[in-house]
A protein has these predicted regions:
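N-terminal lobe of the biotin/lipoate ligase/transferase fold
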Residues: 4-144
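A residue-level signal for conserved active-site and pocket-lining positions in enzyme catalytic cores
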Residues: 33, 48, 186, 197, ...
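Short, conserved beta-strand/beta-arch hydrophobic-aromatic motifs that form part
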Residues: 59-66, 73, 144-164, 168
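A structural signal for short, well-ordered beta-strand segments
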Residues: 93-95, 135, 147-149, 160-164, ...
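Well-ordered alpha/beta subsegment
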Residues: 116, 120-124, 190-209
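Short conserved catalytic/interaction loops centered on acidic-Pro-aromatic/His motifs
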Residues: 128-130, 158, 169-174
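A hydrophobic, small-residue-rich beta->alpha segment in the mid-to-C-terminal subdomain
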Residues: 165-192, 198
Length: 211
């Protein structure tokens, strides 16, 4: 885990801790987020990871029900949005951020996060667009990135997922996030080094939190 002080704003020294979790079960990560929030940290945390195959059901979902015995399992969660899919080859970023120390209103967190991810994609000359109504990033009307967050006790949790080279057959067995669209992978459009891409994203997220 990398941990260091990177900025000062509003006369408050704010630490951002980046943590690489690798391939990890969804429920294990969720429990770790809850434990961190209960500790009321003074710092921001951004976790980079991939999940074992799992469908997660958001609070807006009305059609799909939880079924932990299926393969992959369907797990009910408390994030915003509907149902999405996580699997290896999808880069996930969880934001456990102290809402009192953001350099922008908490209501702008989803918008700022999508714009930040979009700026990283723009460096690859990839044509894409942000959909504010159904939050995410789209390439040729196919969804490549999804976002869903929640705030509890003045902390955000959950976050952003970006399909790099994941299992689209399973993903597209549902309507991604309840939309009549297909999911897509970045590697279908651009040649991308995952480690460099993650580094670019984390640098952009750092700037997002220090403006």
């Amino acid at each position: 885990m990398a941990s260091y002080v990177i900025c000062q704003f509003r006369k408050i020294m704010t630490e951002i801790r980046f943590k690489e979790l690798g391939l990890i079960e969804y429920t294990e990560t969720y429990d770790a987020m809850m434990q961190l929030i209960e500790s009321q940290p003074s710092f921001h945390s951004i976790w980079s990871l991939e999940h074992y195959p799992v469908f997660t059901i958001g609070i807006s979902e009305k059609e799909i029900i939880e079924d932990k015995l299926k393969t992959p399992p369907f797990i009910k969660t408390d994030r915003g949005g509907k149902t999405t899919f996580h699997a290896p080859g999808q880069q996930v970023f969880y934001f456990i951020l102290n809402m009192k120390k953001l350099p922008f209103p908490p209501t702008e967190l989803t918008k700022k996060s999508l714009e930040t991810a979009s700026s990283a994609l723009a460096s690859y000359d990839l044509k894409h667009n942000i959909n504010a109504r159904d939050p995410g990033i789209f390439i040729e009307k196919q969804k490549v990135a999804s976002i869903g967050m929640r705030i509890k006790k003045n902390y955000s949790y959950h976050g952003l997922s970006i399909n790099v080279e994941t299992d689209l057959d399973t993903f597209n067995s549902i309507k991604p996030c309840g939309l009549n669209v297909q999911a897509c992978n970045l590697k279908d459009y651009i040649d991308i080094n995952v480690d460099n891409f993650k580094k670019d994203l984390l640098n952009n997220f750092q700037r997002m939190l220090t403006k």
